[in-house]
Amino acid sequence: MNESGFRSYFREFAPEFTLLEPVSTFEQSAVAEEMTERLLRDHRDLSGLYVSGGGITGALAALRSSGMAGKLNVVGYELMPVTRDALLDGTMTLVISPPLPRLATAAIRGMIAAVSNNSEAKATTTTVLPFEIYTRENL
């Protein structure tokens, strides 16, 4: 889902960019590091990197060891200590983070409504929660 939204955005608002095919990290930092090193080596004109799943520590390690930290636009997913540090030191540009407490609350409310006796509450509902966006400047 993360990747399809990313690609959709670029199709609509930045069609001049060439998006590479995604590579799987299998949620492993070592694999992400190797894949990032390969991308940096094979695509010298790379202007950005979007890490939408696991392995962010490996991708960040590859950026730092290659000297590319701070030279690419790097977007990651979920604010946690490693991504916070990467924002602060300039290795990452942006972190998209789901509002986990609000997401959990909405899920529990939905489950309660689904098992309640109120027929209106049993109707399918959709709750849209805005994602939180973090940059170095708003931490």
Show where each model-derived region lies:
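Short, solvent-exposed amphipathic alpha-helices that sit
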Residues: 1-16, 31, 35, 58, ...
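Hinge/cleft segment of the Venus flytrap/periplasmic-binding protein
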Residues: 99-139
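Short, well-ordered coil/turn elements that cap or connect secondary structure elements
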Residues: 14-17, 69, 89-90, 128
